[in-house]
Amino acid sequence: MKKIKLRDYNSNMGIFIDVNYNDSKIVDNSLHIQYDNLLINHKELIDKSKKYYIYCNGGVKSRKVVSMLEFYGYDVTLVEK
């Protein structure tokens, strides 16, 4: 599992997805896709040809999402606080 710190992310790296249930904007121009919605509907919501950076406040949900999306062949990186 690839990981980076939140402070090291910049928008040129790829698409930032916040999987928290609240709609707070941690990063400008980020996507907010709730955890369960992304797990169930990833084929409709994201594109395998793009690079994604997955974040949540606690880290548990984002870690699960990254593991699952890696399994399905997505280019994802876990973003930690």
In which residue ranges do the predicted regions lie?
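Flexible, polar/low-complexity N-terminal or interdomain linker segments that lie immediately upstream
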Residues: 1-27, 35
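A short alpha/beta connector and helix-capping loop motif
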Residues: 27-38, 53
